């Protein structure tokens, strides 16, 4: 990882180079790097009496394979979530938007490279990698929201802007994405 530097025997992460891939967490021999824990923030949202929705990553099925979807959703509601919805709904929204953008681009600019190259914005770590390591390709990143952001917007449009959305999934990069686009 190009963002990890060793200075005076200690590894540090250079924020300007970090693409949020999580390699520093998995490769640190001293186990000094950790994924940020947002349990306190989530509990604060519950305590404020807000409607808090869980946006559940599709990977939940492999992480909680001993439980049915219904059991997991019921457990999350017992913890205080108002409702549970799969982030995959956001992926459907993004797929439709991508198809529309692709059709528009190919109709307007059939001979241009822009009509032939589309880089998905679905993965915030990939987007950061392109912006930091391959900036010449940044213009080809679609302006679609990521599935997480599309899902959060859908929930807020459906249930009101005053509700909160908490992403539950394994992706470190989505934590920063949620910070940038609350």
Describe each PLM feature range.
Residues 1-19, 23-39:
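Iron-sulfur cluster-binding cysteine motifs and their immediate structural context
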